[in-house]
Amino acid sequence: MKVTDVKIRKINGESRLRGVASIAFDDCFVVNDIRIIEGEKGIFIAMPSRKTTKGTFRDIAHPVNTETRQVIEESILTKYQDVLNNPVEDKPEQEN
C-alpha cells in the first residue's frame, strides 16, 4: 500500500493541536481527521477516535503494525513541515 496524497489543515491557537491531516492510500482509500499534536517530547499524530459511552476513546482507524504507523507518521509530519516552511498566502477575493 502506497501513500498517494496527504492534506494538512493548520490549526492556529494556544492548544496543543497544531493541525489535522487526511491521508490517501493507492488513490482509493482515505483516512480523515488525523490530529497533529505538540506533546512534551515533540510533535506526533493521533489517529481518529470516538468517545465511547464509558467515556474512553477508541480509534476508528489505525495501523496494525509499527512499519505502517511509521510510514503514516513520517508522511504526515513531512507534509506538515512543508506547510509550515512554505505558507500559502490567502488569495484576495475577486470582485464580480
Curated annotation (Swiss-Prot):
Any one Gene Ontology BP term: sporulation resulting in formation of a cellular spore
Which InterPro entries does the record associate with it? SpoVG (IPR007170), SpoVG_sf (IPR036751)
Q: Which UniProt keywords apply?
A: Cell cycle, Cell division, Septation
Q: One Pfam family name from the record?
A: SpoVG
The organism's superkingdom is given as: Bacteria
Q: Is Cell division tagged as a keyword?
A: yes
Q: Its function?
A: Could be involved in septation.
Per the record, the similarity remark reads:
Belongs to the SpoVG family.
UniProt-recorded name of the protein: Putative septation protein SpoVG
Species whose genome carries this gene? Phytoplasma australiense
Q: What phylogenetic lineage does the species belong to?
A: Bacteria, Bacillati, Mycoplasmatota, Mollicutes, Acholeplasmatales
